A protein has these predicted regions:
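An acidic site on a long C-lobe helix of protein kinase domains
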Residues: 26, 71, 113-117
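Gly/Gly-Pro-rich "capping" loops immediately C-terminal to redox-active cysteine motifs
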Residues: 24, 33-35, 43, 47-81, ...
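Electrostatic cytochrome c docking/interface patches
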Residues: 6-37
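Cys/His-enriched microdomains
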Residues: 40
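Second-shell loop/turn segments in exported
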Residues: 17-20, 63-64, 107-111
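C-terminal capping alpha-helices of c-type cytochrome domains
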Residues: 5, 77-78, 94-130
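Phosphate/oxyanion-binding loops and surfaces in catalytic or ligand/nucleic-acid-binding neighborhoods
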Residues: 82-85, 128
């Protein structure tokens, strides 16, 4: 469980089974977050079915088919804190504020994404099926 300003969640195995907000996110908003280089910044490392985006990453797995590879809860944990599954990951924890280093004073205590935004991205990623 997370304390403080973040909503609590429970990790079960390799997943966070329950929605952070109690509701399913909006896939259209989630897609917008994924392609927004100022917000999610996902395409700095990942590529995917985003033909309008000319510069996509090649450091991390392609997002195409992610909805077939992982459950909703598995995707949620990877967004919240991928480091729990792979301590060597370069993927930032999008919904964690404790134990981080090299965080600007202006951003300390603030997650990269809100709980609602995490749920929106999860909703979008579940649509990316093989």
């Amino acid at each position: 469980m997370i304390a403080g300003s973040l909503l609590p969640y429970q990790i079960v195995g390799d997943a966070i089974p329950a929605s952070l907000t109690g509701v399913v996110g909006d896939a259209a908003r989630g897609r917008a977050i994924v392609v927004d280089r100022r917000l999610g910044a996902c395409l700095l490392c990942h590529s995917g079915p985003f033909s309008e985006e000319k510069f996509q990453g090649n450091l991390a797995p392609d997002l195409w088919g992610v909805g077939s590879r992982w459950s909703t809860g598995q995707m949620r944990l990877r967004l919240v804190d991928a480091g729990r599954l792979n301590p060597d990951t370069i993927m930032p924890p999008y919904y964690r504020v404790e134990g981080l280093t090299r965080v600007s004073a202006a951003w300390r205590g603030t997650p990269i994404l809100t709980a609602e935004q995490v749920e929106d991205v999860v909703a979008f990623l579940t649509t990316l099926r093989d």
